[in-house]
Amino acid sequence: MTKYIFVTGGVVSGLGKGITSASIGLLMKARGYKTTNIKIDPYINYDAGTMNPYQHGEVFVLDDGGEVDLDLGNYERFLDTELTFDHNITTGKVYSTVIEKERRGEYLGATVQVIPHITDEIKRRIREIAKDYEVVVVEIGGTVGDIESMPFLEAARQMQLEEGRDNVAFVHVTYVPKLKVVGEQKTKPTQHSVKELRSLGIQPDAIVARSEDPLEEAARKKISLFTNVPEEAVISAYDVEDTYEVPLLLEREGLGKYLTKRLKLEDREPDLKDWEKMVAKYKALTETVEIAIVGKYVKLQDSYLSIKEALKHASVSNEVKVKIRWIEAEDVETHGTKLLEGVDGIIIPGGFGARGAEGKIQAIRYARENDIPFLGICFGFQLTVVEFARNVLGMKGAHSTEIDPQTPYPVVDLMPEQRNLDRLGGTMRLGAYPVKIKKGTLAYSLYNKELVYERHRHRWEVNPNYIEALEKAGLVFSGVAGDDERRMEILELPDKRYFIATQFHPEFKSRPMRPAPVFHGLVRAAKEYKQEKNVTH
């Protein structure tokens, strides 16, 4: 019998429900239970693909091409697993299916309503995934009380009734503020949030209380009394230095043990040794390197969450802490490359559109001319080709047709299959594709494989008509698409200390114990470069 753990949130958004859900998943997996995580997003968008990163953070891409919420990235990293597009349930998907069924006449003339038709479709989607697992953690996005999440909470309530109380548990994540004036933790917002949840027919089994400092005993007792939750199930999730500490904190607080007992599962000893080692290693790092990320969404760092995490993974493997210098690409256009002075490495991440493109190109030139360890990703890969064409091959005005359709040298062009599309959503080259790597290259030394699968999200590519000229001038295309060798995937400059760019997004497959090879290589090169600089000064 599959066990379900629903994670809801109250008081305010952005409390870390995603990290809490990922941590619960890890605690169950560490006990030897076959576990997966589902994210419910109550927005009406079908998927996260067309959303502005400023509103929603990065769009995470899965192997099957699903463009999903960044929380699924956390689930994949914490559980070291590969999820599918079906693991992200949105209001848009649910309503689409129900409306399609109604049009096909599957409801036989019934009035189609939120209950039972929408709620039934939600339950069907959850159970469809649950078939292969012993434990399923379902995070319901938004805050209790939001109008959008009502059908999902109702579906969860019904599931407890249908599956039996021993098979469905509810964990409610709330916020316990501390008012400076009185210096005590206030439980009233939590009480009201649980009251709201109860009014929907859901009694939480555990409360994860988010706070700046550990939960005081008086606050714990009060929460327990007013929310009808045993004291042992009021979990103190205070702020920690790093998100990877959260599972260990929740385990120490007894959440894993409590949930196994509550769901009538055998309480096995969790195996978290590797995780503990990784966290201890990261916390012990003293040596640092500074890597610049030159992007167009840097005001919201969640826009580049997977890159931040991949750098963290590479920190552990290289025993050096990465400090990120966030640089707005447009600022490079106005203030020049002095903003990059002193960095040990430079990353140009993915992105779309003209804003900040020239600033990114200046940063690429600065990295190339000053031999600073460099990694370009997706749009960063394409702009590296543009920079090289302009400044090495002398192709004045060379550009991507995405930004300048009239460029005299369209070195980056729309892929042929993208030319006649009239829809934006879900139509890019998305998901895991094979990449063939040439032996004897930097890319090969990083991957040690001739064929790898990496995740993509793009419409434009290096124009095959310019490849010969670019290679003649010294640019090496060390990786090509496994399904079409005219499609370039990796480029490098062999005469530089570390200069590489990829059409794919390596950050999406990076894991805490297995950093993405190009990130590992970048941090290693940055560490060596900093040591060299220190010797010469």
From Swiss-Prot:
Subunit structure: Homotetramer.
Family note: Belongs to the CTP synthase family.
Pathway: Pyrimidine metabolism; CTP biosynthesis via de novo pathway; CTP from UDP: step 2/2
Location of the Glutamine amidotransferase type-1 domain: 290-532
Gene3D superfamilies assigned to the protein according to its UniProt record, in alphabetical order: 3.40.50.880, P-loop containing nucleotide triphosphate hydrolases
List of residues binding CTP: 13, 146-148, 186-191, 222
Residues reported to bind L-glutamine: 54, 351, 379-382, 402, 459
Binding site for Mg(2+): 71, 139
SUPFAM superfamilies xrefs: Class I glutamine amidotransferase-like, P-loop containing nucleoside triphosphate hydrolases
InterPro entries, A to Z: Class_I_gatase-like, CTP_synthase, CTP_synthase_N, GATASE, GATase1_CTP_Synthase, P-loop_NTPase
GO molecular function: ATP binding; CTP synthase activity; glutaminase activity; identical protein binding; metal ion binding
Protein name: CTP synthase
Activity regulation description: Allosterically activated by GTP, when glutamine is the substrate; GTP has no effect on the reaction when ammonia is the substrate. The allosteric effector GTP functions by stabilizing the protein conformation that binds the tetrahedral intermediate(s) formed during glutamine hydrolysis. Inhibited by the product CTP, via allosteric rather than competitive inhibition.
PANTHER family listed in its UniProt record: CTP SYNTHASE, CTP SYNTHASE-RELATED
Function, as annotated: Catalyzes the ATP-dependent amination of UTP to CTP with either L-glutamine or ammonia as the source of nitrogen. Regulates intracellular CTP levels through interactions with the four ribonucleotide triphosphates.
Annotated region described as Amidoligase domain, given as residue ranges: 1-265
PROSITE patterns associated with the record: GATASE_TYPE_1
Record: residues binding ATP: 14-19, 71
Species of the source: Pyrococcus furiosus (strain ATCC 43587 / DSM 3638 / JCM 8422 / Vc1)
Catalysed transformations (reactions): UTP + L-glutamine + ATP + H2O = CTP + L-glutamate + ADP + phosphate + 2 H(+); L-glutamine + H2O = L-glutamate + NH4(+); UTP + NH4(+) + ATP = CTP + ADP + phosphate + 2 H(+)
Keywords, alphabetical: ATP-binding, Glutamine amidotransferase, Ligase, Magnesium, Metal-binding, Nucleotide-binding, Pyrimidine biosynthesis
Residue runs in coiled coils: none
Domain of life: Archaea
